Each structure stands twice: as structure tokens, then as C-alpha cells.
Amino acid sequence: MEILKGFTAKIQYATRLKDVLRKQQSNKIQHYIPDTDTPLASSSTTSSISQRDISERYQNILVQGDYERTFGKHTVHLLAGFSQEWNENQTMNASRQDLVSDDLHVLNAGTEKFDNDGMGEEWALRSGFGRINYNFDDRYLFEANLRYDLSSRFHPDHRGGYFPSVSAAWRISEETFMRRTRSWLDNLKFRLSYGTLGNQYTSSLYPYMATIEPTTSIMPIGGSITSAMRQNSASNRYITWETI
């Protein structure tokens, strides 16, 4: 959308929704001798049913403005924007054994060995960015970029990262002394650039937090096994962006 002469803006929003329900059932099948109906060994010791429910929500929003102006042999292009993306994922698992009937395809049909577990995770990335382009007579080109990112994967004190870049180019093929070569060399450019990028991906979504989980693998207390919590990963609150 063009708001003023040379100035345009856009807003984009996208979402991805995923809901998956998976069921699996194993029935106990008894084999018999055809002539005598004498039971033989069954194909499995018990019947079972399991169910998994997966729900995922991903969203992304982008707000961006562009301004371009040409005066004489000079062209200036400015760009600034903001973006954010976030994702939430939930998973639930449940299973039962010894079904009262093979025709009941629901968890409540199981009478033994109730197992349940679930997990949830989420992440977000917020970014601001800008760019300046300068062009003189389509011969001398300059570009500067800067972006600032905030990632939920890092401790609040270390979530931000600055990533600048700059480049300059000379289209020597546009110079008058290259005029005779334009029939076979119409675009020759020398370019020099320097920049940095950030990498936020680590072995987990929360490397700065020490996570815990329930366990029964501990020494018995009073002759019986006791449930407890244990730390299953080391934390590093100082971990931050990898600069490339």
C-alpha cells in the first residue's frame, strides 16, 4: 500500500495450525485346533490401546515500511520493519491394557496398566531490522543493514543480539572508459562486503534452565521405592547468540 509518494507499507500475518489424533489397538487373538477347538497359544498375552494427541500453533507477523527517492543521479532507498514469530506445541500420550471388548476403541475399555504422559513447549523470536541503499548514477552502490533479534531460547539478560552488515560496489562497466567493451561485457562490478548473522539454535529450547523429571531410580527408603525428582540437564544462563 502506497501511503505517500515514494513510501509504501505492508502488514502480513500467517498462521499454521496442526491437530493430530493417533490411535493404535492390538487385540489378543486366540488360536484353536480346528477339529477339536482345543486352544493353542495366543498371538499376544493381552490386548492394548494407545492414543496420542498432538496440537501445534505457529504464528508470524511482519510490519514493514519502504521509502525511495530519486533526485538527479542519486537514489536513496530506506527500509525498516518489525517481525515476530511464536510457536506452541502440546503432546499427550495415554495407553491401557486388557480391553473389556475388542469392539470398544476407546481408552476407557482398558482395565489394566494405565500409562499417561504429556509434554509442552513453546518458543518466540522478535526482530527489528533496517536497511539503507544508496545509488549514484547506477555506478557507485552502498548498502548498510542492521537487525536486532530477541530469542526466548536464552536467559532474559542475554536474549538480544545485534547483527550489522555493510557493502560497497563499483559498476566499472558503466564508466566511460569501458564503453568499447559493452557489446560483450555489459555488467562488470566489484563488490566488497562485511556482515554478521546470528544462530539461535541449541540442543534444546531452554538451555539456560535446569530441567527436572520424576523418577523412581533411587535408593529405597524404608525398604520401599520412593518417587522423586531429578535434574536431567545442566543449565547455562550465559549462553547466547552464535555470531557467524
Model-derived features: positions:
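Extracellular/periplasmic, surface-exposed regions of secreted and cell-surface proteins
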Residues: 1-26, 39-244
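Short amphipathic helix-turn modules centered on a small-residue break
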Residues: 28-30
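Extracytoplasmic gating/loop element in the C-terminal half of outer-membrane beta-barrel translocons
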Residues: 33-34, 151
